């Protein structure tokens, strides 16, 4: 359309809509012409040979209409077109500058922290540098991850910390509450460490009412319960669209309800670098304008319901980007040129405050999980990822054992709480979303790829090592109170709050149960547990034991009783490659090491799909012909 989707301020301070046309002068000399739009007074121009870009304006259009655009020469029309003019939506674009926090990716992890502390110093400087800018253009910055601010408070002098507090109080710097951008492998209990900085911030008088998750297309549902309890009003989700899909077809504000019904106002934003897709960091309106206006027109086409939109960008088009004031200058220049759309340098909460105030009664509510499928790098490190997940579970048990010790009036070692925090912090550093250096796919053996993986994996193994030692501490506190008998004893703990009967694996030295010695594990009433040896070491054996009725937040002690061998051979029969009991019949393929058949006798049902080209348990090695197909949600160039 010739009618530009912006509004400018006329000479009489009235709003006007620009009209832009291209006129071609085929003559070799200049031609004086008149341009008339609708019934508005004509304006005079001189066309030079070739293509001429002509820009005029008309009073603001308040309803859709079709207007003729006529080019006249010596009073006669030489060209005429009819163009549809529509009212310009009076947009405000809240531009939210942030630094996306990758622990690694652009540089090794050990270099990232010092950079992010420096960025907070820069942000303070830029607040000072833009103090005389118009309010819309003043530097504002949302600190995406609480980790950087938490470390800043520990590593900067009081004078510098006070400057940070000053600009937080003025609303130019905002501190988000979440430690990192998290994957889904972290468990619920670790979020107490994850959200711990909020408490520290409040000790310093620093408010935190926003949670921000970027570059991860989902988030743990338990946070919808936890965040409101901490006084956090808003959740901002900066998506990533590459080889993934996101909920909703446009930016969406909604009340996200937890399983218990607690709401938190949530914004599903577009990509966390959307402003950079427009080239905003280049500071050139001519480059940014068409992309920005196209974006807004697409929102209108999709019936976006608000007159404001929150857009994220970084100072430069990269992760772990330093902040910048280039964009502040562009915002100032834009607002001097256009009345609408209006650009505003803003914090994330400022945008959501506006939406809440103006549209609060029109915001939908959803009670549903918000799962992620973007942080798939963990699949490339099954060993370390399994170690992390197991350690989360182990820490639940260890903390339960320590709680039992406290309930028994045991005195915990002074360093216990520090050790717990260190373990959870190590797990968070492994579980946060960053996986691999930026060149880890194109050059997996380069120094940066190797160094970053070494540091990433070390977090998981550090947590494993320290958890095992903390387990020894907790058991050491309790072992003096455990029941003993004339025979060796085995105590099984249940650190959860319900009675449990489960199978567990126990390692027992040959000094306790000699090799080839027949035995039973019984309670003190003579009831035996089911026990099966799994694998042997030179000095002992691992046993599978089915423990029954272990009391909640308690334990049960059993005796190891030696006995003569039984003549009962059991009810399992093994014939060639077939294993069978009362419940199942399992047929193996010894050539492939797979399962051909698994028949459920109770259900009278075959559980293995015999029509599948791969048997159950088969190893499938798949190679992609190209990675680009992932971004297009298709899979047609591969071999298996």
Where are the regions a protein language model picked out?
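Mature N-terminal, pre-catalytic/accessory segment of carbohydrate-active enzymes
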Residues: 1-102, 110
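Catalytic and substrate-binding regions of extracellular carbohydrate-active enzymes
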Residues: 417, 421, 429-640
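Surface-exposed loop and adjacent secondary-structure segments within mature catalytic domains
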Residues: 163-170, 220-283
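CE4/NodB-like, metal-dependent polysaccharide N-deacetylase domain
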Residues: 191-229, 294-313
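Active-site and substrate-binding clefts of carbohydrate-active enzymes
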Residues: 92-94, 99-102, 250-481, 495, ...
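Alpha-helical scaffold elements lining the catalytic groove of polysaccharide deacetylases
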Residues: 183-203, 275-300, 633-636
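An acidic-aromatic substrate-binding cleft motif
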Residues: 77-117, 138, 227, 575-588
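Metal-dependent polysaccharide deacetylase catalytic core of the NodB/CE4 family, i.e.
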Residues: 103, 134-139, 143-214, 262-271
């Amino acid at each position: 359309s010739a009618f530009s989707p912006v509004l400018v301020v006329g000479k009489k301070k009235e709003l006007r809509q620009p009209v832009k046309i291209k006129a071609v002068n085929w003559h070799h000399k200049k031609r004086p012409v008149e341009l008339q739009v609708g019934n508005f007074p004509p304006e005079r121009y001189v066309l030079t040979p070739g293509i001429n870009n002509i820009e005029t304006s008309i009073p603001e259009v308040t309803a859709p209409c079709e207007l003729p655009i006529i080019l006249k020469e010596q009073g006669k029309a030489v060209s005429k077109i009819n163009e549809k003019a529509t009212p310009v939506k009076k947009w405000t674009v809240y531009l939210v500058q942030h630094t996306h926090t990758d622990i690694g990716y652009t540089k090794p992890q050990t270099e990232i922290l010092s950079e992010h502390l420096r960025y907070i110093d820069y942000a303070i400087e830029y607040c000072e540098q833009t103090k005389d800018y118009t309010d819309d253009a003043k530097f504002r910055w949302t600190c995406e991850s609480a980790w950087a601010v938490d470390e800043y408070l520990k590593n900067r002098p009081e004078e510098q910390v006070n400057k940070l507090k000053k600009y937080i109080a003025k609303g130019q710097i905002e501190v988000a509450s979440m430690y990192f951008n998290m994957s889904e492998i972290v468990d619920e209990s670790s979020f107490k460490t994850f959200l711990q900085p909020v408490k520290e911030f409040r000790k310093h008088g620093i408010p935190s009412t926003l949670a921000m998750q970027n570059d991860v297309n989902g988030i743990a549902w338990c946070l919808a319960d936890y965040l409101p309890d901490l006084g956090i009003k808003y959740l901002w989700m900066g998506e990533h669209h590459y080889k993934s899909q996101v909920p909703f077809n446009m930016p969406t504000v909604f009340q996200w309800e937890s399983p218990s019904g607690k709401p938190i106002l949530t914004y599903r934003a577009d990509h966390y670098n959307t402003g950079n897709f427009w080239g905003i960091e280049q500071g050139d309106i001519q480059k940014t304008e068409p992309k920005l206006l196209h974006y807004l027109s697409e929102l209108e086409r999709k019936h976006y319901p608000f007159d404001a939109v929150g857009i994220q960008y970084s100072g430069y088009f990269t992760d772990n980007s330093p902040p910048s004031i280039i964009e502040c200058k562009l915002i100032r220049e834009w607002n001097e040129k256009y009345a609408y759309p209006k650009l505003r340098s803003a914090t994330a909460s400022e945008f959501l405050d506006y939406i809440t105030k103006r549209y609060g009664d029109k915001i939908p509510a959803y009670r549903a999980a918000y799962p992620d499928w973007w942080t798939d790098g963990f699949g490339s490190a099954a060993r370390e990822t399994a170690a992390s997940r197991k350690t989360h579970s182990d820490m639940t048990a260890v903390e339960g054992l320590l709680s039992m010790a406290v309930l028994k009036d045991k005195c915990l070692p002074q360093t216990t709480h520090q050790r717990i925090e260190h373990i959870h912090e190590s797990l968070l550093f492994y579980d946060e979303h960053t996986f691999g250096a930026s060149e880890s796919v194109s050059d997996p053996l380069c120094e940066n790829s190797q160094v970053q993986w070494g540091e990433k994996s070390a977090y998981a193994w550090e947590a494993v090592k320290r958890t095992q030692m903390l387990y020894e501490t907790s058991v050491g506190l309790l072992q003096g109170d455990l029941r003993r008998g004339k025979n060796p004893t085995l105590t099984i703990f249940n650190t959860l709050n319900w009675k449990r009967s489960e199978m567990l694996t126990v390692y027992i030295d040959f000094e306790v149960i000699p090799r080839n010695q027949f035995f039973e594990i019984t309670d003190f009433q003579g009831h035996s547990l089911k026990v099966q040896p799994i694998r042997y070491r030179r000095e002992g054996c691992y046993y599978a034991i089915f423990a029954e009725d272990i009391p909640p937040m308690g334990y049960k002690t059993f005796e190891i009783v030696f006995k003569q061998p039984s003549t009962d051979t059991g009810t399992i029969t093994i014939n060639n490659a077939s294993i069978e009991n009362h419940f199942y019949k399992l047929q193996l393929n010894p050539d492939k090491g797979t399962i051909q058949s698994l028949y459920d006798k109770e259900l009278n049902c075959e559980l293995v799909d015999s029509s599948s080209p791969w048997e159950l348990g088969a190893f499938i090695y798949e190679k992609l012909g190209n990675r680009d197909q992932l971004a297009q949600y298709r899979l047609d160039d591969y071999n298996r």
